[in-house]
Regions:
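Conserved catalytic-core segment of nucleotide-activated headgroup transferases in glycan assembly
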Residues: 173, 191, 197-299
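A short, well-ordered alpha-helix in the C-terminal region of glycosyltransferases
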Residues: 366-381
Length: 401
């Protein structure tokens, strides 16, 4: 088997949130034809129990504990040396020593980096083909954060956006290939760095459509007689927190005023204090961790994705579409998804439009045409098999000179 070094900023298992879904499917696919040497961080104590599962797919492995609080403090060193804070956040000398050992002792033919913060570990490598999966343009996400933050965080976020964009460009120039999660994201990066356009491509996230299938039987987790709106996601993630807080405060009251029996369920692990506080609002339920999100999707009346901060492709939207649910999404949540608006995916432009569309769909009953079309779109365009074939082609190319 050909040997490959794979560096990931977060352990690629379990595949229960956006980045881990993509990094896991990459690992699983790569392991079919490569001996994969994996270096990664673990930033959730609950994930240590999965290391044997991950090891079963790998050759050599290195798992490094990352305490988010301590890493944030350590990242401030970037302020003193003019670096994006992302780099010291993900810097670890033990991981660097392991990378050096693997590259010095194993016949590694390809290096795959998942997310920009991990590229620093192979910045001096020249004799091995290097590919980076940026996934999203993270620098733009930091700029989005800055628009809703007060001082001094808005200054820090703008600084991070500017410096990280410079680093993203540096990586794209130096590496042999770069990938993103959608054609939209790749095209935006083409505009930011035209000279590297020939090296930049994309492969879509996929959905396991057999797992997320409306044909399966699921227990109903909701009380009888209620109309349910549901949002799913990791509820300590800033973009998700912003989305549900905005929806709960700016959209949901208008819906409840018209339809008092409607309830809004926020489903996902580790709800932040701001999210947990929403449970005090009439008609809002915060579940915390659930072992299986599919029953919550299957029995919901509508799925909402009101993200105001977003890049790339939202897996939560694709999963709901695969379950034949009507998804009402913000423009940011819908960006990058190849779906016909109003026929496969419904887009709401602002809080008034969101409330109007939710009320209209709930009052007018079933729309099986939209539901079926949504799943067909996922089946046609969002399978892992189709997307990951592009990575195979990149790995088989000769190293750029």
């Amino acid at each position: 088997m050909r040997e490959l070094l794979y560096l990931v900023h977060r352990i690629p298992y379990p595949p229960n949130k956006g980045d881990k879904i993509r990094s896991y499917h990459l690992l699983e696919h790569l392991a079919q034809h490569h001996r994969v040497h994996l270096g990664t961080f673990i930033d959730d104590e609950g994930d240590w129990k999965y290391i044997e599962k991950v090891r079963s797919l790998c050759g050599e492995t290195c798992f490094i504990n990352l305490h988010p609080g301590m890493a944030r403090v350590g990242s401030l060193s970037g302020l003193l040396c003019g670096k994006p804070l992302t780099l010291p956040y993900y810097w670890n000398s033990r991981l660097q020593a392991w990378v050096n050992h693997v590259l010095g002792t194993r016949p590694v033919e390809n290096i795959l980096i998942f997310s920009s913060g991990m590229a620093q570990y192979v910045s001096r490598v020249r004799h091995i083909r290097r590919i980076i999966d940026f996934v999203d343009i993270d620098s733009d996400k930091w700029m989005q954060y800055s628009t809703s933050a007060g001082w001094p965080m808005n200054w820090i976020y703008r600084r991070e956006s500017r410096l990280l964009l410079g680093y993203e460009k540096e990586i794209a120039r130096a590496f042999d290939s770069a990938t993103f999660v959608s054609e939209t994201e790749a095209n935006l990066f083409h505009q930011l760095l035209p000279e590297a356009a020939a090296k930049v491509t994309h492969f879509n996230n996929g959905v396991d459509a057999n797992y997320f299938s409306p044909q399966n039987s699921y227990p109903n987790p909701y009380p009888e007689g209620k109309r349910i709106l549901v949002f799913t996601g990791a509820m300590d993630y800033r973009a998700n927190v912003d989305a549900v807080v905005w929806f709960a405060r700016s959209v949901f009251p208008a819906i409840r005023a018209k339809l008092p029996k409607v309830e809004f369920y926020i489903v996902g692990a580790r709800p932040s204090d701001a999210v947990a506080a929403l449970a005090a609002f009439p008609g809002i339920r915060v579940t915390g961790f659930v072992s299986d999100v599919r029953p919550y999707l299957a029995h919901a009346s509508l799925v909402v994705a009101p993200l105001r901060i977003a890049r790339g492709i939202q897996n939560k939207v694709l999963e709901a579409m695969a379950m034949e649910k009507i998804v009402i999404a913000s423009p940011s949540a819908a960006e990058g998804i190849r779906a016909r608006r109003e026929e496969e995916l419904v887009v709401a432009l602002d809080e008034q439009d969101f409330a109007h569309r939710v009320i209209s769909f709930l009052q007018n009953g079933a729309h099986p045409g939209i539901c079926r079309a949504a799943r067909v779109r996922v089946l046609e365009d969002y399978s892992w098999k189709n997307g990951l074939g592009r990575i195979d082609r990149l790995l088989s190319q000769p190293q750029a000179v």
